[in-house]
């Protein structure tokens, strides 16, 4: 028997219900900044999940962009290397 089946049988009592999934999707939807997803209309779970993935990707891109800008600023600033090292250590 595969370990996946074993785990599935062992955790049978802890399976997530459709209601719990719906609640989690609703919570995800509340976290999304998209105004169009905030309507009271029922939005398909697949759309909420897709929008969540898109939002996470955009956040990753924003972090990358800000990190690059910060690196450029640190490289051109007049601060001492000790000060720059402190700032870098705080950011990592």
Curated annotation (Swiss-Prot):
Keyword terms of this UniProt record: Brassinosteroid signaling pathway, Growth regulation, Nucleus, Transcription, Transcription regulation
A Pfam family assignment: bHLH_ILI
S-S pairs: none
UniProt subcellular location: Nucleus
GO cellular component, one term: nucleus
Residue span(s) of domain bHLH: 5-59
Gene Ontology molecular function: any one: protein dimerization activity
Transcription recorded as keyword: yes
Highest taxon of source: Eukaryota
Note: Plants over-expressing ILI6 show enhanced bending of the lamina joints and produce grains increased in size, caused by elongated cells in lemma.
Function: Atypical and probable non DNA-binding bHLH transcription factor that acts as a positive regulator of grain size. Binds the transcription repressor APG and forms a heterodimer of antagonistic bHLH transcription factors that regulates grain length and weight by controlling cell elongation in lemma and palea. May be involved in the control of lamina inclination through brassinosteroid signaling pathway.
Summary of subunit composition and partner proteins: Interacts with APG.
Protein name: Transcription factor ILI6
Species: Oryza sativa subsp. japonica
Gene designation: ILI6
């Amino acid at each position: 028997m595969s370990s996946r089946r074993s785990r599935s049988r062992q955790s049978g009592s802890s399976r997530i219900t459709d209601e719990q999934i719906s609640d989690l999707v609703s919570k995800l939807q509340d976290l999304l900044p998209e105004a169009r997803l905030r309507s009271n209309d029922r939005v398909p779970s697949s759309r909420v999940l897709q929008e969540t993935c898109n939002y996470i990707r955009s956040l990753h891109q924003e972090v990358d962009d800000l990190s690059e800008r910060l690196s450029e600023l640190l490289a051109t600033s007049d601060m001492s290397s000790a000060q720059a090292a402190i700032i870098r250590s705080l950011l990592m």
